[in-house]
């Protein structure tokens, strides 16, 4: 959720805002419809407002919660500089345009990350969060890779055939299924580790964007280096990338506001 927030107007908590009768907010955008934990963030904010009203922004609450969630599941700790202010604009179309899509090729990914001041190292490291990721079957996520990759009823040759067969048999049994949940790092998606990268190197990255990481010599070599090294090295580098992402286009000073409730802008 923190990643999805930072890629649209910066890390400003705009992903937390609800839609209204005259505005479709970021939550309504297809890339955000699989996000979970909004109620948890809202509850955290309510506790913060009760203790120190008007001090801690929703953007900071989300950034801190993302860090603590990773630590809780056994991942690394990183510093989260605070002082972000909340945005007042949340637009579904912007989210659709700005959040990297699961069908992005390498060039698309590189451009998307560069637009936010992030480099190829950041791309690889932040993708590593897919080690605890889940997705849904469906043509807008990855099922076209199984059933209709080029529009001719074919399968993506870049996807390991045994893995594809298993997905078709046990998970995404039809192209139209868009509800079945699939682990992005099967067998260890509750463990923050190097499993995702190992899947990618086996041609078992579930998204086109996952597979795209092996299409570039630098990113492919970087993944191989991470996999061959200790998990502690990945943790160190992932933490640095998360701290860097948390600074993307932040609002400070008099820009934005400190929202009282994360789901609505202040009146």
Locate predicted features:
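Catalytic cores of secreted/periplasmic or lumenal enzymes
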Residues: 1-267
